[in-house]
Amino acid sequence: MSKKVFIKTYGCQMNEYDSDKMSDVLGAAQGYEPTDNVEEADLILFNTCSVREKAQEKVFSDLGRVKHLKKKGALIGVGGCVASQEGAAIIERAPYVDVVFGPQTLHRLPQLLAERERLNRSQVDISFPEIEKFDHLPPARVEGASAFVSIMEGCSKYCSYCVVPYTRGEEVSRPFEDVLVEVAGLADQGVKEITLLGQNVNAWRSRMIGAASALSSEMADFATLLEYVSDIPGIERIRYVTSHPNEFTPSLIAAYDKLPKLVSHLHLPVQHGSDRILMAMKRGYTAMEYKSTVRKLRAIRPDMALSSDFIVGFPGETEDDFSKMMKLIDDVGFDNSFSFIFSPRPGTPAANLHDDTPHEVKLRRLQHLQTVINDSIKRISESRLGTVQRILVEGASKRDSTELMGRTECNRVVNFCGQPRLIGQMVDVAITETRSFTLRGEVVTQNEVLTG
């Protein structure tokens, strides 16, 4: 009987990608098969996030819930950014944990588990071996028409509030050809949509070698990579996340004019709308510069859907600062957002800033911001009524398993009736109804996809 591994993922899409790679490497090296039932798992892994305090504490709460499974012989591991930040302190707090590993050492999981068994003691490896992990991972295995590809690791921006540079290390780009080989392999498996991942994905840079360039010293930037990915047969859509406003170069903006496969959806975190707060955050741009980038993008793609991150209640935030953030939100018109009250992270400069704003004030501001964003989402959804949207069908609807769901180019979920054979296909859907954050529609494509 094969061994089972249960993986719970917290946080960002980088972690989702890493969790898939954990499953791949354990399957290839030790025959583990994934399971959604933690009770039957031989190995339980938590791939953690340390961006906010609540996410970090939830890990220890979840660890406590599976502690009893040790009696059945299950092994327990903690990976991700909390593991990188806390290291051996996790073992001190939860001594029943068997392995602790960082984002850059997930490829060493089989060796860590073997050492745990051989030495009969917990193992910790949270080193930063740069990009080594990609050299030791098996070829990607996918089910479905969409896939993530990590193209870089770490962050070198050192925003004053952010723990990522300390948990994932400095920015390191994957080699140009490695990325193209992985994308081509996924396309051969039927993947139609690729999402390129990185903490600051548009900061990617790599030397072009081999057939890709006659000049071995030529450097490729992110826009160049997008062009080459776009040329890979079978790839019909390209997304990427997360981008940094400071890395939005003229060549990247121009890519939206040259590459029709590059979708009209962008997650471009602004974090705040007050220049004073942006400076305290060490973001490196002003609200006007951010809006200038948006204007240039929408001059090329008027229907560009934008999502962003917002931090409410950063130390020293005044009502005037908050009003400036709300003005930016009104000026830009966001299709979605991820907004949170500031959470001080140990070891970051912002954790030491004086903060005298009452929590109830921060909560009121957050609720107001989210109400405004939700109203914007509703207006944008209503503007889609009566339009025909090109949908990549992903699978059964989460609301109703008898229906299908997919995403528009602008990343809006659409539910509709259709045959299972449409899964993995691109179809045209007429939008007939809007809901809070999703759309409903009817398939209007009339071709071999529907009749074959």
Curated annotation (Swiss-Prot):
Signal sequence, start to end: none
HAMAP family: tRNA_metthiotr_MiaB (MF_01864)
One Pfam family this sequence matches: Radical_SAM
Cellular component per GO, a single term: cytosol
Protein name: tRNA-2-methylthio-N(6)-dimethylallyladenosine synthase
Annotated EC: 2.8.4.3
Primary localisation category: cytoplasm
Binding site for [4Fe-4S] cluster 1: 12, 49, 81
Domain Radical SAM core: 141-379
Domain MTTase N-terminal, residue spans: 3-118
SMART domains from the UniProt entry: Elp3
Cofactor: [4Fe-4S] cluster
Domain (TRAM): residue spans on this chain: 382-445
Catalytic activity: N(6)-dimethylallyladenosine(37) in tRNA + (sulfur carrier)-SH + AH2 + 2 S-adenosyl-L-methionine = 2-methylsulfanyl-N(6)-dimethylallyladenosine(37) in tRNA + (sulfur carrier)-H + 5'-deoxyadenosine + L-methionine + A + S-adenosyl-L-homocysteine + 2 H(+)
Subunit structure: Monomer.
Record's subcellular location: Cytoplasm
Keywords (A to Z) from UniProt: 4Fe-4S, Cytoplasm, Iron, Iron-sulfur, Metal-binding, S-adenosyl-L-methionine, Transferase, tRNA processing
Annotated [4Fe-4S] cluster 2 binding sites: 155, 159, 162
